[in-house]
Amino acid sequence: VPKTTRHHKNFQQGYLVQLKQVLKMKDLNRLHVSVFALHLLLTAMFIYVPSQLINFAEIPLASHGWVYLPLLVISLFFAFPSIILAEKYRKMRGIFLTAIGGIIAGLLVMIFGFESKYILLLGLGLFFIAFNVMEALLPSWLSKAAPIQSKATAMGVNASGQFLGAFCGGILGGQLLILNDTAMGWSILTAIAIVWLLISFGLSQP
């Protein structure tokens, strides 16, 4: 009976090599920061916005679903053409940066017009449109930027950034409620989005 040679692959070592490779790629790191910032802002908003709708828009908590649903549907009508434009005409970087700008614009509207019901809703609408564009673009860009042999590792790091962003957003949203200063609260969220935009300017067209 011929002897067979068995080769044992060190999967842990291979994973660590891939992880180091992924963490050294600047564009991937910017995408990880993006998913972190996006879900931080979203979670903070969902904690912070209900009090704003009650206090300034005079919309009872039980009716908030009827605010979010139309805004979500409207935002999808804007999101789909943006995604097609980004993929078909290779405008992903421009639309990506524009979407972050849309998030900033929505937050700025809420800084200066939070006392008006309709301006507050306009700001929320801008935010949700930009959010849905970003939510669709990020996975697509990640799959293009990640090396073939390290795609799973890159997606794992990105998913960790998403959950960490939601965790930090929950903490931030709670702190904004405790702060009890509406203009300052929106300003803090806007500042985070501006830092995110500045970091994202370094992204290359995929």
Predicted regions and their residues:
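C-terminal membrane-cytosol helix-exit motif in multi-pass small-molecule transporters
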Residues: 1-7, 199-204
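Helix-to-loop junctions at the C-terminal end of transmembrane segments
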Residues: 78-91, 177
